[in-house]
C-alpha cells in the first residue's frame, strides 16, 4: 500500500503534463485521443488503446483516492467517483486547451498551480464532493 498516494499521483501528473508540453509524440497522441472525427488505421488503433488507458487511469484514480482516504489524507466522506471525475475532467480540459491554444497555458509552469488547486479541493471539499447518505 502506497504511503503517500497523493504525492505519487502528483508526481505522475506533473510528468504527464511535462511530457505533453515538451515531446511532440505525446502531443500527437493526445491530439488523436481528443479528436472526435472518425479515424482509420493506426490513428484509430492508437485512439482505441488510449481510451482504454483512460478508463484504467480513472479506475486507478479512484483506487489512489480511496487509499488516501484510508490513510487520513482526504476526508472519509469524499465521494470517490465524483472526486476522480473532477480530477480527470479538469486535467483533460487543461490538456485540450493547451493543444488548441498553447500560448494561453504553460503546462509546465501551471502544473503546480493546477495540482495545488485540485488537491486543495479534495482535502477541503465542498458539500457536493461528499457522499450523500
Briefly describe each language-model feature range:
Residues 1-28, 80, 84-87, 127-132:
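Hydrophobic alpha-helical connector segments
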Residues 10-13, 55-58, 62, 108-119:
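Hydrophobic core segments within long, regular secondary-structure runs in both alpha-
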Residues 1-2, 18, 31-34, 48-54:
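Helical cap/lid subdomains and adjacent loops of hydrolase enzymes that gate the active-site channel
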Residues 7-10, 22-24, 43-71, 81-85:
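Amphipathic alpha-helical packing segments from all-alpha helical-bundle domains
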Amino acid at each position: 500500500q502506497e504511503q503517500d498516494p497523493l504525492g505519487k499521483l502528483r508526481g505522475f501528473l506533473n510528468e504527464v503534463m511535462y511530457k505533453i508540453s515538451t515531446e511532440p509524440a505525446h502531443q500527437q497522441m493526445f491530439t488523436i485521443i481528443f479528436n472526435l472525427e472518425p479515424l482509420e488505421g493506426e490513428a484509430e488503433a492508437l485512439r482505441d488503446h488510449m481510451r482504454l488507458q483512460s478508463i484504467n487511469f480513472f479506475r486507478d484514480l479512484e483506487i489512489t483516492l480511496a487509499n488516501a482516504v484510508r490513510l487520513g489524507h482526504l476526508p472519509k466522506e469524499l465521494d470517490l467517483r465524483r472526486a476522480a471525475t473532477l480530477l480527470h475532467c479538469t486535467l483533460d480540459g487543461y490538456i485540450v486547451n493547451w493543444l488548441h491554444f498553447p500560448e494561453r497555458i504553460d503546462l509546465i509552469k501551471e502544473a503546480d498551480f493546477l495540482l495545488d488547486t485540485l488537491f486543495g479541493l479534495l482535502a477541503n471539499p465542498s458539500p457536493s464532493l461528499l457522499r450523500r447518505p
